[in-house]
Structures are given as C-alpha cells and as structure tokens.
Amino acid sequence: MQPSIAPSTPIPRQETVELVYRIFGDVLVPLEQVRERWFRNLNKENFSKALACGRIALPVTTLDDSHKAMQFVALDHLAAYVDQRANQAGSARRAQPGADSIAS
C-alpha cells in the first residue's frame, strides 16, 4: 500500500524534477547548497529564519535525530517549490493591467 499524499501537497512537474536533479545530482539536496544556488541574497542566519517562519516554505529533513545532523531538502519538495513560485509569478503577471498588450 502506498502512503497517501495530502491534498495540499503540490505535485511538481516531471520536467522540473529532472532539471533540479541535473543541477544537484541527488534526491536529498544539502540545505546550504540550496541557499548558495537559489537564495544567495540571504545569509545563513536570514535563510534559517525564513525557513523557520514559513516565508520560504521548504520542509527540511535530516537523516539523524542529532541537532548537529546535516540538513537537506528533498528533491521533489524543492521542485514543487520552484513550480509554485513560477506559477505565482505568472499569475501576478497576468493580473497586471495591460499585461496582454505588452509585446514579447
């Protein structure tokens, strides 16, 4: 029996999963690599705060219960987050007055 997926859990596009895998090369991405690649505007402390308060909605996992355990983001969660942010940007763009009349 497969585990159930919560209805609110976004399912990433396969293309996004493949792209993120090509970038990072593993199913678990070290949190610091995520910050350095896609959140370089945030230092370690501000990135940690943004994760803790939910401003950056990425679930963080470890492979050990130790407080010193290395932190990771699962590839599918990272891909879903990228898709979600891209969709939000597209929705915001379409909602702007005159967005249809701007030539590409």
Curated annotation (Swiss-Prot):
Q: Spell out the molecular function terms from Gene Ontology.
A: DNA binding
Keywords assigned: Activator, Antibiotic biosynthesis, Bacteriocin biosynthesis, DNA-binding, Transcription, Transcription regulation
Is Transcription tagged as a keyword? Answer: yes
User: What does the function comment of this entry state?
Assistant: Activates pyocin genes, probably by binding to the sequences conserved in their 5' non-coding regions (P box).
Is Electron transport set as a keyword in this record? Answer: no
Gene Ontology biological process terms, A to Z? bacteriocin biosynthetic process; positive regulation of secondary metabolite biosynthetic process; regulation of DNA-templated transcription
InterPro entries associated with the record: Tscrpt_reg_PrtN (IPR020518)
User: Which protein, by its recorded name, is this?
Assistant: Transcription regulatory protein PrtN
Pfam families hit by this protein: PyocinActivator
